[in-house]
Amino acid sequence: MAELKSLAKDTAIYGASSIIGKFLNYFLVPIYTFSLPAASGGYGVITKMYAIVALLLVVLTFGMETGFFRFANKGDDDPKKVYSVSLLMVGGVSLIFLLLCLVFLNPIAGLMGYGEHPWYLGMMLIVLAMDAIQAIPFAYLRYKKRPIKFAGLKLLFIFVSILLNILYFVVMKGDDVGVAFLINLICSFVVMLGLIPEFREFRYCPDRLLMKRMLYYSFPILILGVAGIVNQVG
């Protein structure tokens, strides 16, 4: 009974943080709508960029969050080793992807319609890499049953984002869409700092067999995730 109550409490905290986060994010829509000039693309620039980021985030994490839970709870492997291997794979892929994109930033930005402002794309690529890497420590927090820190960091991101957006777009009457992406970058970095204790638990222990097993399990989740995002933003 005690375990059931604990599970219900943890689930409520995770769910509440998600609901509150989405609710607070709605406050940003009218701020962007009324502050961003139509000549610069307005709020559409932000929605387009975030749709791309959402899709790429699913690709870069390739179902490894679920894979981590599966293998950490299975009991056949050391959970800390599973965590380290998961973080190594997602972190390695994300950093390589980021490096390649930054090297070819200008042509990629041109193809995507951001040729005049490649730094928009550059900032969001850094955000994308950080968010992908953060996914594993957040999954680790859930595995360790630490819902307060999990929810606290998620809400910290939202509150800092809203505060900075209000400061720039409402108080300072700013209208540069690039600042919205810069704020997102700042917030993601703040969350990275909050996850430092979890990153310190990483140990470099590449295990090819474990990697193959986890990838085999996670690949179908990647396909479902991509399909879900395409259906959501399509």
Give residue ranges: language-model regions.
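Alpha-helical transmembrane segments of multi-pass membrane proteins
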Residues: 55, 91, 99, 113-134, ...
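Short membrane-interface helical motifs at transmembrane helix boundaries
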Residues: 96-114
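Interhelical loop/hinge segments that connect adjacent transmembrane helices in multipass membrane
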Residues: 1-7, 148, 152, 177-182, ...
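Residue-level recognition of transmembrane alpha-helices
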Residues: 14, 18, 47-50, 90, ...
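Transmembrane-helix boundary and interhelical linker motifs in polytopic inner-membrane proteins
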Residues: 2-5, 33-43, 56-90, 140-149
